[in-house]
Regions:
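An N-terminal assembly and electron-transfer interface module characteristic of large anaerobic redox
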Residues: 1-446
Length: 446
């Protein structure tokens, strides 16, 4: 099967992770643009270079696209770039000319512009550092009250006008994609929404798109992986098992639906089918939270897993979402008392609940339907998740105040030995901070 993939940007979870997952099946021929063509925290993607890459692809079975990358230069540039609606429209019309020539199924997604409830502008326009929370409040109250919030008198007019204009531009571009969908260009088109609250312009826009026939999904970075999973032929039957069944109606951080609905939605988007335990191909254990989702980096604690966990004698995978962005140490310690044999189909505790679930299900589905199963690639995927989600995010990161590869490498050694023992394979890796910040680390195999 030949699949081409245009990521959101060049972060490890967006670029390296899908490549690693695809390698689990030697029967997948995976086409990925050069990393240098993609954007990062400061630079937008080389859009013309990506257009040329798309033109040069051989005949494919499936094409997975981040439309933000091809329209704006990436997810972050979609919120920052100053180009007008007409400029973006002209660009995506050229993209459409390329796509109509592709005789394959196209799986695409575009983001609904987020509204972060903070004054942190690393991924936003400069003015977010001073006015971000006020803009969030303005959006929230205007939607909730059904009329313009009085906060409009606090935010400088030129800033509010720019923000509203950027939102309107992106929304109108999304409406164009929806027309393409109705014309039959896409097999699947998803409008993603992340950093959601109960009210806000992003929530309104999602409802408008749904009313027009669009499909919206909570999440962002994992959606290309869910679409990759959807492109894999076959329907896998999955039974979710919540380790805290009385709390599955609670809502995860950065999301707007319960963890139970999030799990169901991720299974369906990935081309899976919800099943009961007796009929399931794979069991999905969800280490969910009891009262609220913790957040290790933010110092928000929550009740850790306190029971026993014995792996089943059948295929299973584990979404560890008790904390946002990092493992539940108690649960991992309990998990590691087991033998992770051929029935183990994956573990993830990557960032948000949606991130964890989407990436986990994708890896499991590729393994389940693999025509040429590559065990080494699967083990590399699990090494990456345990070292990133457990060793780094839940432990070593807390000892660092700034990116320091030497300190990171030294701190990871004891965890590497544990992972070697549990996965019964050598761990020979090196680390880097590709975006020069603590938030993400790259695990590279030597």
């Amino acid at each position: 099967m030949k699949i081409a993939f245009v990521p959101i940007d060049n972060r490890p979870v967006c670029y390296t992770l899908p490549k690693l997952i695809s390698q689990i099946d030697g029967g997948i021929e995976f086409f990925l643009p050069e990393r240098s063509l993609l954007g990062d925290l400061e630079n937008i993607a080389n859009i013309q270079g990506l257009f040329d890459w798309l033109k040069g692809l051989p005949k494919l079975d499936a094409l997975v696209l981040s439309l933000d990358t091809l329209a704006y230069g990436g997810l972050i540039p979609s919120r920052r770039c100053p180009e007008t609606f007409d400029e973006i429209k002209s660009r995506i019309e050229k993209l459409k000319e390329i796509l109509v020539e592709k005789e394959c199924k196209i799986y695409a997604f575009s983001s609904i512009m987020r509204i972060s409830n903070n004054n942190y502008n690393q991924e936003e326009k400069e003015y977010w550092s001073k006015w971000g929370k006020k803009i969030f409040d303005y959006s929230f109250q205007t939607h909730k009250l059904g009329c313009e919030s009085c906060i409009t008198n606090i935010i400088p007019a030129e800033i509010l006008d720019d923000y509203i204009a950027t939102r309107k531009r992106n929304f109108e571009i999304n409406k164009i994609y929806l027309e393409w969908q109705k014309e039959g260009l896409f097999d699947t088109l998803i409008f993603s929404k992340d950093d959601c609250a109960e009210y806000g312009f992003n929530v309104q826009e999602a409802k408008f798109l749904e009313d027009l026939g669009g499909f919206t999904k909570t999440g962002a970075d994992e959606i290309p992986l869910s679409l990759l999973s959807r492109a894999i032929c076959g329907e896998v039957k999955i039974c979710p098992i919540f380790l805290e069944p009385n709390s599955k109606d609670l809502i995860s951080n950065y999301e707007d639906v319960s963890i139970e609905k999030s799990v169901q939605g991720q299974i369906e988007l990935a081309g899976g089918k919800l099943s009961d335990e007796n009929d399931a191909d794979i069991l999905l254990y969800v280490n969910n939270f009891v009262d609220h989702q913790g957040e290790i980096v933010m110092g928000v604690n929550t009740e850790s897993f306190g029971g026993k966990f014995i792996v089943p004698n059948r295929p299973y995978m584990i979404a560890d979402v008790r904390f946002a962005n990092g493992s539940d140490n108690n649960f991992v310690n309990e998990l590691f008392k087991n033998n992770l044999d051929e029935n183990f189909y994956g573990y993830s505790a990557w960032n948000t609940s949606a991130n964890s679930l989407g990436s986990l299900i994708c890896g499991a589905k590729v393994k389940y339907f693999a025509k040429k199963y590559n065990q080494d690639a699967f083990k590399k995927l699990q090494i990456t998740r345990f070292l990133d989600d457990w060793a780094y995010q839940a432990n070593v990161r807390q000892t660092l105040s700034e990116p320091d590869v030497d300190k990171l490498t030294a701190g990871m050694k004891e965890f590497e030995k544990v992972v070697e023992n549990i996965l019964k394979t050598e761990v020979n890796v090196k680390y880097s901070y590709p975006w020069k910040r603590l938030f993400e680390v790259e695990v590279e195999f030597n």
